[in-house]
C-alpha cells in the first residue's frame, strides 16, 4: 500500500507539473515538502488509512479480492469504527494539502500573468523605437521627420548635420542620403532651424541660377555680391554696379574693371603682369617647385569662376563644379563631353599633365597611317562574327523562351530551326550594312574631324613661318617652366627684370647681370637650334645679346615666346633684327661683362664656309607695352643697320676709369661682299707680316703696360648688329674695306670717361688651358689681316665729336692676346679705345 501511495503522489505531482511547466523550479520545491509531509502521516496513521485515497478523487469505490482475504477472519465493529475515524483524518489531511497546492498554483499563475503583462508592455515600448540608417541608433518615432520627396527616414540629428555640411560646401542640390531624390527647401528649413544657414543656402541657390544666365555679370569689386543682368550690352560694354555705395564700372565682355582706351586682351595682360609682380615681391622673390605645385592645385571653374581645389596626384581629371554643375577637364580647363578623353586632344582621364605637342603629333600621324589597317582588321573580324553570332544568339533565345512550357518537342524544334534559318539569311545583310556605314564614318572621323579639331585648337603645331613657308613646331609647350618649376632662376634679379618685359618692342635696360643664357636655358624656352654650323652663330647671339634678359622672359614665359632661327644665304652678309631696339643699361655691369665674354668666347669657333655668311633672325613675341632705360645704348633698327653712335655713357657713371668698346662691321643686305679675292689677299699677307706683328705686340705691351688698366667693357653694350657682324667679319675676313679702325692714345682724360670692367676669369682660363697656341695664332692672323690695310678712321665719343688717328687700330683681340702671353706680369695690359664706325 505504501508503494501505491508513493506512486499516486508521483502521478499527482506529475500531473500538476504538466499543468505548470513554466514554474518547474517552484514545483520541485513543493514536491519535496509534500514527500516530507506524507511520510509523517504514514507514521501516525494505520496501514488501512490509505484505502480511502480513491475517495479524494471522487472515483467509484472498488473492492479487491485476494487469496489472503478469503482465509482471514472478519473484523469486529469497534475496531472497524476506529479504523474509519483514522481514515477520515487521513482524508482531511490530504484535502488540506491539495487545497494548499491549488492555492500555490493560483499564486504562480497570477505571477505569470503579471510578468506576461510586463513583457507585453516592454515589447510595445520597444516597438515604438526605429533604428536610424545613418548613426545606427534607435530613436523614437517622433525623432524621424517626414520628407516630402521620398519615404526614407533618418533621425533629425543626422539630417541636420548632413545639411550643414552640404550647405557649407556650396552644394545646394541636396538629395536624400539613401536615394537621389532632392530635398524640398521647406523640409530643409524645418530640419535646420537656423536662419544663418538658410540665408546662405538661398544665396547659393540664387547664385547658381544667375550663373546659368548668359547675360548676368557680377560686380568685380571686392565684398560686393551684386549682379547686373544686361541684355544687349555687347555694343556698349560699360556697366555700372547698382548697389548703393558701390558704383563700380566694369566691362561687359571681360567682366573686369572698366579699361578705357584699351582692349580686353591688353587689359588682361596688364593685370596678369601686375599680379605676378605683386606675387614676386610679396613672396621675397622666390619661386620654388612647391609654390608652383600649390598654384596648380587651385583653379577656377570655366563657367562660374569659383575656385576649386584638387590634389595634383594624377587622379581623375573629369571635374564637376559644385556651384554651377559645370563638367570640365582639369588639364585644359574647358567644358567637355563624354568623348573628350577619347579624342586625341592630349588630355588623359588620369594623369598630372596633358600630352606634349610632339606626342600629340606622333599620335595623330600614327592614327592617320594606321587607321586603314585598324579599320580593315575591325571589319574583317566583325563580318564573320556577325554572320555566325547572330544565328547562335537567335537560336538560344528561342530555346530559352520555350523551355519550361507545356509545348510539344516537335513544335519547339520547329520554331528553333525556323529562327536560325531566318537569322542565317539576314545576318550577312546586317553585317554588310554595318560595315558599309561604320567604315566611312570611322574614316571621316580619323581623316576629317581629328586633324581639323587639332589644328583649329593649335594642337597640331603647324603655322606659317614669317614668309618661310609652313613650319611644324615640335617644341613642347609643357616643358616651358611655369612658375619657376624647371628653370634655374636666380632670385636676386627677378623683380628688376619685370620692368622690362618686352625685348621686341622695348629695351632690356636695368637688368641685373645674375642671369645668363646657356645651351640648356635656350632649350628650356623653346629655342630652335640647328645641328650644323649655324649653332655657332646662334650661341654667339644668345651669349652676346640675350644674356641677362631671361630674368624677364623666365617669369612671363607663359606669354612670351622666343624663337631664334639661323638661315644661310649665298653671298650675303647681313644681320636683320626684327626685334626692334635692344639695349643694355647702366645698372647691368655684370650682364654686360657676361655678354661680352660670351661674344669673345664664341668668336673663336671656326666656321668652314666659303663665300657663305650667316643671317640670324630673332622673333620675339611679347607684351605690347615697353619700358625704356635712361642709359645710352646701341640699337639695331628693323633693316639691320645701326642708327646711333655707341659708347655713350650714363650720367651716373663714375669718372676716372677707362673702357673700350668692341670694333664692328656694318653689314647690309643690299651690298655684296667680295669675300673670295680679299680673303686670298689677306691670307697671303698674314704669313708675311707675322714677325712684324710680334714685334709690334711687344712694343705695344711695353708702351701700354704702365699706362692703362685691364681691358674693360663699356657700360652700354654695342648693338646686336655691331657686335655680331664683327664676329662674322672675323670668321670670313671677306670685306677688308668695310673694316675701319682707329687708334687714339692721346691724353688720359680721353680714357677717363669710360668705366673699366674686368672680363670673366673663367673665359680666360678656359682659353689658356684648351687652345692657347691656336687662339694666339688666330689673333695674330686677324691682326695682320686687319692692320694690313691702314685707313684713317673716325671715332665718335660721348659728346658726338669725331676723333681721328693715324696709327692702325688694334682690335680687342690684341688685348686678349696680350693677356694670354703676359699672365706672369704684375700689371695687366690695357686695351685701346675702339670706336664703332657707322654710316647714317
Curated annotation (Swiss-Prot):
Pathway(s) where this gene product acts: Protein modification; protein ubiquitination
Pfam families named in the record: IBR
Catalytic activity annotation: [E2 ubiquitin-conjugating enzyme]-S-ubiquitinyl-L-cysteine + [acceptor protein]-L-lysine = [E2 ubiquitin-conjugating enzyme]-L-cysteine + [acceptor protein]-N(6)-ubiquitinyl-L-lysine
Binding residues annotated for Zn(2+) 3, in chain numbering: 219, 224, 241, 246
Keywords carried by this UniProt record: Cytoplasm, Cytoskeleton, Membrane, Metal-binding, Phosphoprotein, Repeat, Transferase, Transmembrane, Transmembrane helix, Ubl conjugation pathway, Zinc, Zinc-finger
SUPFAM superfamilies on file: RING/U-box
Zinc finger feature spans (RING-type): 132-179, 301-332
Subcellular location: Membrane; Cytoplasm, Cytoskeleton, Microtubule organizing center, Centrosome
Protein name according to UniProt: E3 ubiquitin-protein ligase RNF19A
Compositional bias of kind Basic residues: 671-683
Zinc finger (IBR-type): 199-264
UniProt gene name: Rnf19a
Function text: E3 ubiquitin-protein ligase which accepts ubiquitin from E2 ubiquitin-conjugating enzymes UBE2L3 and UBE2L6 in the form of a thioester and then directly transfers the ubiquitin to targeted substrates, such as SNCAIP or CASR.
Binding site for Zn(2+) 6: 329, 332, 340, 347
Major location category of this protein: membrane
Enzyme category, top tier: transferase
List of residues binding Zn(2+) 2: 150, 152, 176, 179
PANTHER family per record: RBR FAMILY RING FINGER AND IBR DOMAIN-CONTAINING
Coiled-coil intervals, chain numbering: none
A GO CC term assigned to this protein in UniProt: centrosome
Bilayer topology: Multi-pass membrane protein
Residues involved in Zn(2+) 4 binding: 251, 254, 259, 264
Span list, region Disordered: 40-61, 625-685, 700-721, 786-808
CDD domains associated with the record: BRcat_RBR_RNF19A, Rcat_RBR_RNF19, RING-HC_RBR_RNF19A
Amino acid at each position: 500500500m505504501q508503494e501505491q501511495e508513493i506512486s499516486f503522489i508521483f502521478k499527482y505531482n506529475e500531473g500538476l507539473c504538466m499543468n505548470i511547466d513554466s514554474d518547474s523550479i517552484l514545483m520541485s520545491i513543493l514536491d519535496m515538502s509534500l514527500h516530507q509531509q506524507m511520510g509523517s502521516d504514514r507514521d501516525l496513521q494505520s496501514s488501512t488509512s490509505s484505502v480511502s485515497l480513491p475517495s479524494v478523487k471522487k472515483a467509484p469505490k472498488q473492492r479487491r479480492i485476494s487469496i489472503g482475504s478469503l482465509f482471514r477472519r472478519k473484523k469486529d465493529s469497534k475496531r472497524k469504527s476506529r479504523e474509519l475515524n483514522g481514515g477520515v483524518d487521513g482524508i482531511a489531511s490530504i484535502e488540506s494539502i491539495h487545497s494548499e497546492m491549488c492555492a500555490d498554483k493560483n499564486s504562480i499563475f497570477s505571477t505569470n500573468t503579471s510578468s506576461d503583462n510586463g513583457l507585453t508592455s516592454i515589447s510595445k515600448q520597444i516597438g515604438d523605437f526605429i533604428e536610424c540608417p545613418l548613426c545606427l541608433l534607435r530613436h523614437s518615432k517622433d525623432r524621424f521627420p517626414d520628407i516630402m520627396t521620398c519615404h526614407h527616414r533618418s533621425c533629425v540629428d543626422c539630417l541636420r548635420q548632413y545639411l550643414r555640411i552640404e550647405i557649407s560646401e556650396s552644394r545646394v542640390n541636396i538629395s536624400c542620403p539613401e536615394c537621389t531624390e532632392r530635398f524640398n527647401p521647406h523640409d530643409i528649413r524645418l530640419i535646420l532651424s537656423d536662419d544663418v544657414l538658410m540665408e546662405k543656402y538661398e544665396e547659393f541657390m540664387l547664385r547658381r541660377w544667375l550663373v546659368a544666365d548668359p547675360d548676368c555679370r557680377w560686380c568685380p569689386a571686392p565684398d560686393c555680391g551684386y549682379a547686373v543682368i544686361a541684355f544687349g550690352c555687347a555694343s556698349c560694354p560699360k556697366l555700372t554696379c547698382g548697389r548703393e555705395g558701390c558704383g563700380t564700372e566694369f566691362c561687359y565682355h571681360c567682366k573686369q574693371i572698366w579699361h578705357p582706351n584699351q582692349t580686353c586682351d591688353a587689359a588682361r595682360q596688364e593685370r596678369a603682369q601686375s599680379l605676378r609682380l605683386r606675387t614676386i615681391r610679396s613672396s621675397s622673390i622666390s619661386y620654388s617647385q612647391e609654390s608652383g605645385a600649390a598654384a596648380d592645385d587651385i583653379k577656377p571653374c570655366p563657367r562660374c569662376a569659383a575656385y576649386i581645389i584638387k590634389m595634383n596626384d594624377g587622379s581623375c581629371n573629369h571635374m564637376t563644379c559644385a556651384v554651377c554643375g559645370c563638367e570640365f577637364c582639369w588639364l585644359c580647363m574647358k567644358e567637355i563631353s563624354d568623348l573628350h578623353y577619347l579624342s586625341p586632344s592630349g588630355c588623359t582621364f588620369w594623369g598630372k599633365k596633358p600630352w606634349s605637342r610632339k606626342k600629340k603629333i606622333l599620335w595623330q600621324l600614327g592614327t592617320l597611317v594606321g587607321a586603314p589597317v585598324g579599320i580593315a582588321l575591325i571589319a574583317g573580324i566583325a563580318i564573320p562574327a556577325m554572320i555566325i553570332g547572330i544565328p547562335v544568339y537567335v537560336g538560344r533565345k528561342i530555346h530559352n523562351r520555350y523551355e519550361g512550357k507545356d509545348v510539344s518537342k516537335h513544335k519547339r524544334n520547329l520554331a528553333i530551326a525556323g529562327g536560325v534559318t531566318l537569322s542565317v539569311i539576314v545576318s550577312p545583310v546586317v553585317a554588310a550594312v554595318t560595315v558599309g556605314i561604320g567604315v566611312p564614318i570611322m574614316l571621316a572621323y580619323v581623316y576629317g574631324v581629328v586633324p581639323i579639331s587639332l589644328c583649329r585648337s593649335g594642337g597640331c603645331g603647324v603655322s606659317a613661318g614669317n614668309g618661310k613657308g609652313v613650319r611644324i613646331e615640335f617644341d613642347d609647350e609643357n616643358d616651358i617652366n611655369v612658375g619657376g618649376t624647371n628653370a634655374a632662376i636666380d632670385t636676386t634679379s627677378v623683380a628688376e627684370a619685370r620692368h622690362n618685359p618686352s625685348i621686341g618692342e622695348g629695351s632690356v635696360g636695368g637688368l641685373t647681370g645674375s642671369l645668363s643664357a646657356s645651351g640648356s636655358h635656350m632649350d628650356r624656352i623653346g629655342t630652335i637650334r640647328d645641328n650644323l654650323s649655324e649653332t655657332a652663330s646662334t650661341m654667339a647671339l644668345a651669349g652676346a645679346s640675350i644674356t641677362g634678359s631671361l630674368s624677364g622672359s623666365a617669369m612671363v614665359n607663359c606669354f612670351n615666346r622666343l624663337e631664334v632661327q639661323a638661315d644661310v644665304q649665298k653671298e650675303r652678309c647681313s644681320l636683320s633684327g626684327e626685334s626692334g631696339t635692344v639695349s643694355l643699361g647702366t645698372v647691368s655691369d655684370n650682364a654686360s661683362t657676361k655678354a661680352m665674354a660670351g661674344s669673345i668666347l664664341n668668336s673663336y669657333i671656326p666656321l668652314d664656309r666659303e663665300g657663305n655668311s650667316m643671317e640670324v633672325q630673332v622673333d620675339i613675341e611679347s607684351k605690347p607695352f615697353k619700358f625704356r632705360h635712361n642709359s645710352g645704348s646701341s640699337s639695331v633698327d628693323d633693316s639691320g643697320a645701326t642708327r646711333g653712335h655707341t659708347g655713350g655713357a650714363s650720367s651716373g657713371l663714375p669718372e676716372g676709369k677707362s673702357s673700350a668698346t668692341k670694333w664692328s662691321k656694318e653689314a647690309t643686305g643690299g651690298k655684296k661682299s667680295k669675300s673670295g679675292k680679299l680673303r686670298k689677299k689677306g691670307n697671303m699677307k698674314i704669313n708675311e707680316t707675322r714677325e712684324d706683328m710680334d714685334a709690334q705686340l711687344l712694343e705695344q705691351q711695353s708702351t701700354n703696360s704702365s699706362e692703362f688698366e685691364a681691358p674693360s667693357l663699356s657700360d652700354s653694350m654695342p648693338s646686336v648688329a655691331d657686335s655680331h657682324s664683327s664676329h662674322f667679319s672675323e670668321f670670313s675676313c671677306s670685306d677688308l674695306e668695310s673694316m675701319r679702325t682707329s687708334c687714339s692714345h692721346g691724353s688720359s682724360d680721353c680714357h677717363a670717361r669710360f668705366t673699366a670692367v674686368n672680363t670673366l676669369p673663367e673665359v680666360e682660363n678656359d682659353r689658356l688651358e684648351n687652345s692657347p697656341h691656336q687662339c694666339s695664332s688666330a689673333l695674330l692672323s686677324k691682326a695682320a689681316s686687319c692692320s694690313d690695310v691702314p685707313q684713317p678712321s673716325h671715332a665718335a665719343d660721348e659728346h658726338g665729336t669725331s676723333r681721328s688717328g693715324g696709327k692702325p687700330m688694334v682690335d680687342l683681340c690684341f688685348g686678349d692676346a696680350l693677356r694670354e702671353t703676359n699672365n706672369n706680369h704684375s700689371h695687366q695690359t690695357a686695351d685701346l679705345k675702339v670706336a664703332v664706325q657707322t654710316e647714317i
